[in-house]
Each structure stands twice: as C-alpha cells, then as structure tokens.
Amino acid sequence: MGKKPLNENQVKSLRKLVSGKPLHELLLNLSVDLMLRGSDLLNLKVSDVISENGKVKSEVMVKQKKTKKSTLRIPLSDHSIKTIQKHLMDKSRDDFIFKGQKSYTGKPISVIQYTRIVKQWMEMLGVDPIDYSSHSMRKTKPTVIYEKTKNIDAVRRLLGHSSVTATSSYIGVTDNSALDLARTYSF
C-alpha cells in the first residue's frame, strides 16, 4: 500500500496547526483537494486557481505529467477557496503557488521539501512520520471518499487511473475489506 493517507481528523487538526503559515495552509488544503502527484501539484501557477477576472476558480483543470492522460477537472473545497483568497489574490498569475523561501528564483519548492513539510506535520500531530510522505496527501481524499461510498470507479476517475485494479491497490483495498463489505450486505 505504500505511504499512509491522512484521515479526516488529522486534516482538520492540521488546518488549525498550520493556520497563519501561508505556504503550509495552501499546501495542506490544495494537496488534499486536488489529489495530485507532488510534481504536478508544485508546478501549479496562480493562473490555475484564479481566473483572468480575478475570481477564484471553483474547479481546477490539470493535465497530469506522468500519465499524460486527458485533463482532470477537480473541484475546490471551501477551505481551499478561502485559503486562495487569503494568500494569492495579490500575486501575479504567472507565479507558482508554492514558492519557497528562495522565492527570488521564482521556482516552487521541491518534492523533497514538500515531503519534509508533510513529515513535519505528522510530528506536529504526534504521529510517527516514517509512514508518511508527500504522496500521503494525494491518497488522503480518495481514501476517505472510497471508505464512505465504496465507489471505486469514481475514485479511479478522480485520480486519473486507467484501471480499477490500479486504484484498488493504490488506496489499499484488501481482500479483507472486500470480504467485510460482502458481509455487510448479507441477506
């Protein structure tokens, strides 16, 4: 299954813990909402989330670099919209959203730095960071959606996966969880 996803309570706790830290607020909310690989997330620009007329977009269109598949259309939550309004409205549309402390370079933080931040968040939560990385953030929302709905095809589409098999493996649908589901619907 790889790195663990966060659960809803961990995300809610982190929102409080990172409040007031622009990079962390943006990274937390957008990484959970957009469900993107680190490289795709970090390459987002302000123009991806704010329209030409200066309004925050309700959906983000992203073409995943790894798969080069069709463009994904992903909705933004109220948390992300408010965070964008709070931290990005005065930025140039050409700016990367996730600029690091060396912002004079104009480049976004690296995936390595993103992983360090995620591990730092886990430490803030009192959780062993060994099982978490930037990829944990990509897995968080799809795992919660699957746990609540059991709709693996919807999750597959949100992640841009080509097969349900890949998605099942990715979010850790095990034989035991499938059997538990079958037991739930005995009649």
Question: Which functions belong to the PLM regions below?
Answer:
Residues 1-187:
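Conserved catalytic core of the tyrosine transesterase superfamily
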